[in-house]
Amino acid sequence: MTPPPPAPESSTPGPVSDAVRGNWVDRLAPPWSRPYLRLSRADRPVGTWLLLIPCWWGLALAAATDGWRWADLWIALGCAAGAWLMRGAGCTWNDLTDRDFDAQVARTRSRPLPSGQVTPRQAAVWMAAQAGVAALVLVTFNGAAILLGIAALAPVAVYPFAKRFTWWPQVFLGIAFNWGALLAWAAHTGGLGWPPVLLYLSGIAWTLFYDTIYAHQDKEDDALIGVKSTARLFGAQTGRWLALFLVLTVLLMAAAILAALLPDASPVRLLLALCAPWALGWHLLWQLRRLDADDPATCLRLFRSNRDAGLVAALFLAAAACL
């Protein structure tokens, strides 16, 4: 693939303010590519993990119902590649639509578009390139998964605008970010049913939990420029709402597992799978007990910890599938 055109000479080459210092993009990527990789959030991989993990949940739970197959290894790898590419394309789209807002927020004004490192046209070309490669991965899956992958474009397209018209943009993020639970289930089974739908709803509740924490970083700037979020909506009641999302995450995931595995699964397989919501719930409780919604550094640290929480749940589901 021909690399995108170099960023304008007048662009600011510095890293994005909320990226980890010394990340691989800053250290290893060719200078011409850094603004594009920053657009894709390659310097902040936690978002890719949060997009990928529901895919692995869906695949592992599907495999636990009828046994894993060698083809599942490709589905898992294909989901990883697709998550990296589509998270990059989605973030590029988000930055294109939000560039005027981002220029007014301290945490985001150093991003490539508002800082002038990349032009809107260059960003659009980069977005199309990422989506095109992701499509090549998608077409290796079965027909049901391909249709679901195409349908996923709708919530991805709508999400950046949600903060303009609703106090619940995190719901739209959850709809988009957890779509992989449906897609990966369909890639294994060839269809859908109640178990993946319940798992999908569990993922949406999880997203409401972690992205409300994330949104507390920007609540003061968001109030000044009129951006809506659950962090602003909940205010001092954030802890109670997060507790509700925690309970919903655990109960819906447990319901998905029971719907998928009963009555045929062995007790050991069932108990091992149920360790997934149990472990995830304990981690979310740990986050809730340590949350200081007025400390951006704490909010960012807790948000990032959801990668580990989600992966532990995925490991329990994968172990149940391998029994």
What are these regions (language model features)?
Residues W49-L59, L173-H188, L233-A236, R240, ...:
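Small-residue-rich segments of transmembrane alpha-helices in multi-pass membrane proteins
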Residues L52-T97, R107, A131-A135, V139, ...:
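Membrane-embedded alpha-helical segments that form the functional core of polytopic membrane enzymes
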Residues E9-Y36, C91-V118, T212-G235, L288-T298:
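Cytosolic, membrane-interface loops and tails of multi-pass inner-membrane proteins
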Residues S33, L37-R38, T108-L198, H283-D292:
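Intramembrane alpha-helical segments
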Residues A76-A83, R99-G149, L224-A273, D308, ...:
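Multi-pass membrane catalytic core of lipid/isoprenoid biosynthesis enzymes
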Residues R41-L51:
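Membrane-interface helix starts
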Residues A29-R34, T249-L251, A255-L323:
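Extended hydrophobic alpha-helices typical of membrane-associated regions
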Residues A60, A64, V139-F141, A162, ...:
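Helix-loop junctions at the membrane-solvent interface of multi-pass transporters
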